[in-house]
Design a protein with these regions (language model features):
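Glycine-rich, anion-gripping cofactor-binding loops and their flanking helix/strand elements
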Residues: 85, 209-214, 221-314, 396-428, ...
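Active-site nucleophile and cofactor-binding loops and adjacent substrate-binding regions
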Residues: 25-29, 49-60, 75-81, 383-384, ...
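Phosphate/pyrophosphate-binding active-site segments
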Residues: 292-386, 495, 511-518, 522-555
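Glycine-rich, acidic loop regions that bind phosphate or pyrophosphate groups
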Residues: 104-156, 245-348, 449, 474, ...
């Protein structure tokens, strides 16, 4: 057996022993030893192999799977720019705390500084975005390497998952030729792992920060983000605290859930009389400025739940950080909760009444219709930009829905691949809500070979022909209208149906509410539902909704 084959087989075997069950592979020559070892392991049922030809999409596919399962997923590529294309997904995994094991093949050292083809500097390619980096020694025809190879895989897995802060790790693996098996199975020593399929190195469960934050307010507010929404909702229900989520009503349940929280926090007269003494924040809020404003208020004590020591606090106003909320030291004020509930009902009614007068379709209206149509226990992947805001503002209460958002660095890239990855490991129907630019940015994520599985995923594309989010920001003010379309609106006129046809993905344009509802019925396989909206209406609609909510909510 040649050294590259031996090393690759051991690496794959130890990944399996470390509970890695999904691996995304990008084809190439230099990573051929790993490719063949992964194929054999998949054929034996030891792992599921997903093959993609676009490295950027492949890495985001792995992010989606790892985020949904909470377990490390490995992604493998050849040398050169292939490795560089993993970088956006590595950055997202870093900031979102997603366990990702990146394996990049490389030329051996004697070729890298000698003008060899397809060579870049892959050592520490991802900088500080990875929890751990190692360049493995080039495999050689000698004994004593099995323990080294297996030990390094255990180190990488532990850094990705086993310590306080989950995230990406990077192993750069130089391979010398020959890169394919030579027909011999002989080696200098046993290449077996520990008996019983155990890891080479058993590691302790490091857990999270060994501390609890201690709520001590009678008039407090729970702010839930990302994967902590359901747990935060349960805690709030148990202790009588109002709870607001960045996902609106998705994942929130119980009488203390405030589905209109994003609207209420933007009503100045309401917050003036309903400023909480403490905010118990779980996760990392990123969407709304009114949320950041509350967390920055020096009169509000912020207690943050975070499973690692890298806590988000742009305003530098966090008082405590811990792994969970302890029992509160004081009983909640029932009148405080009742006032939030009354305001929530008034805001929701104002939004419904205003939306009823709007011509179909709007992004906000589509978000609400989608949420109502989702089957029980569905997964909803929400794109950045307007969809993240539309879901929070118009989604409505659905405590049974699972939500995933790429809010680590909140980019629009890789969302199609992320959604496919998350749907691949979700046991149930899956949906995605994304904008047209997000869809176009990762349309190559639709490309799957005939041997690859396609999940049951409906991708809803809200097509406003450009950057609709900018109409809601400062750039969308009338004072900047002269250059808006060229540098912010960026209309494209792309034919999404023709694009989908090229990838052999079913596509439909929903032109009426009934067509939209029909298109959302659960169906097997991957499909795209497009709805075309007029982004020139965004700014005015949001202004009318803010005014309606402000008028309906008491101070």
């Amino acid at each position: 057996m040649n050294p590259s084959t031996a090393q690759a087989r051991v690496i794959v075997d130890e990944l399996v022993r470390n509970t890695v069950s999904h691996v995304v592979l990008c084809p190439g020559s230099r990573n051929a030893p790993l490719s063949l070892a992964l194929y054999d392991a998949a054929a034996e049922g030891k792992l599921r192999l997903h093959v993609r030809i676009d490295e950027r999409g492949a890495a985001f596919l792995a992010v989606g799977m790892a985020a949904r399962t909470g377990r490390p997923v490995a992604v493998v590529c050849t040398s050169g720019t292939a490795a560089a294309n993993f970088h956006p997904a590595v950055l997202e995994a870093d900031r979102a705390g997603v366990p990702l094991i990146v394996l990049t093949a490389d030329r051996p050292p004697e070729l890298r500084a000698a003008g060899a083809n397809q060579v870049i500097e892959q050592q520490r390619l991802y900088g500080g975005a990875v929890r751990y980096f190692d360049e493995m020694a080039v495999a050689e025809r000698r004994s004593g390497q099995n323990a080294y190879w297996r030990s390094q895989i255990c180190r990488a897995w532990n850094a990705a998952y086993g310590e306080w802060r989950c995230g990406p790790v990077h192993l750069n693996v130089p391979f010398r030729e020959p890169l394919v098996p030579d027909g011999s199975e002989d080696w200098f020593e046993s290449l077996e792992g520990r008996p019983g399929g155990a890891r080479w190195t058993e590691l302790p469960d490091f857990g999270a920060l060994p501390a609890f934050v201690v709520p001590s307010a009678r008039q407090g507010l729970v702010l839930a983000c990302d994967t902590g929404v359901r747990a935060a909702s349960e805690w709030a229900e148990q202790h009588g605290w109002p709870v607001v989520a960045e996902t609106g009503g998705l994942g929130l349940g119980g009488a203390t859930a405030i589905g209109s929280g994003a609207w209420l926090l933007a009503v100045e007269k309401f917050i003036a009389t309903h400023k909480p003494e403490q905010v118990l924040c779980i996760g990392r809020p990123t969407v709304f400025r009114q949320v950041q404003g509350l967390l920055a208020d020096p009169d509000v004590e912020v207690l943050l739940v975070r499973p690692d020591s890298d806590w988000p606090s742009p305003a530098h106003n966090v008082r405590q950080v811990g792994q969970w909320f302890d029992e509160p030291t004081k009983p909640a004020d029932p009148d405080w909760l009742a006032s939030w509930q009354a305001a929530d009902a008034a805001a929701a009614a104002a939004v419904r009444a205003t939306m009823a007068d709007e011509a179909w379709p709007t992004g906000l209206g589509l978000a609400g219709e989608l949420v109502r149509a989702l089957p029980p226990e569905a997964l909803l992947v929400v794109g950045s930009s307007n969809p993240a805001r539309d879901i929070a503002l118009a989604g409505g209460p659905r405590p049974d829905i699972l939500v995933h958002r790429n809010r680590g660095v909140a980019g629009i890239d890789g969302m199609v691949s992320t959604a496919i990855g998350a749907a691949t490991v979700h046991r149930g129907h899956s949906y995605a809500l994304i904008g047209d630019l997000t869809f176009l940015h990762d349309a190559n994520g639709l490309l799957t070979g005939p041997a690859e599985s396609r999940p049951d995923l409906t991708i809803v594309v809200v097509n406003d022909d450009g950057g609709g989010i900018f109409t809601l920001l400062e750039q969308g003010a009338p004072a900047h209208s002269a250059g808006f379309e060229r540098v912010f609106g960026t209309p494209h006129g792309a034919d999404l149906g023709a694009l989908c046809a090229g990838y052999r993905v079913p596509h439909v344009v929903a032109r009426t509410p009934s067509e939209f509802r029909e298109a959302l019925r659960p169906e097997p396989g991957l499909r795209v539902v497009e709805v075309r909206v007029d982004r020139s209406r965004h700014r005015g609609l949001h202004a009318r909704l803010r005014a309606a909510v402000s008028a309906a909510v008491p101070g």
